Amino acid sequence: LRYHFTWSVDGVINEYCNPCEAIVNGEAASVQPLEGMENFSLDGQQFEAFNTSGGLGTLCETLAGRVRNLNYKTIRHPGHRDAMHLLLHGLRLIERRELLRQVLDGAVPHSRDDMVVIAAMASGLRGGRLEQITRSTRIVGAPLRGRQRTAIELTTAAGVLGAVELFASGQLPQQGFVRQEQCTLSALRNTRVGRYFEALLPASAPPGNTGA
């Protein structure tokens, strides 16, 4: 499958089997997981990306009426999507999720040797001219306070801790529901975990406190 588990097997199954929220041609839509596949290269390495569920949170609601198209895709090594499509649809394991879980849990190894790749692309009119902006980065595991941490552990914790720091400093609403998009990249960069977000910002953005 060109894949190994670094987190929840059930979480991966949900991402690959549940409908995905999106905005298509200006309208809220539900698109199918594993569809919308595209290929791209980052630092000379090839990747594929395809629809998966759950990544946008409330962003479709926030950007309704402001963007024409919005989607969220998971990045994998080439060939992974086709193998999963065979399992889910060729063998119809999407209809038997417990069996799918047993197959994946027994056949796909768990590993702490991982890498997180983030790529964000936006296009639109600026000054009457169509422009596209792309930001991308990759993060690998690293030691933290005497223990080796995986890339998914570091990036997941960084998002949570960055948001907590912004909340504690009064930079986020102090009551009510707080959306993930209210934590701007520029604000997150100025937190103690800001180095994990630095590559996603323009080079001219002011540096923040990136200490551990």
Language model feature labels by segment:
Residues 1-212:
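C-terminal catalytic/substrate-binding lobe primarily of soluble NAD(P)-dependent oxidoreductases
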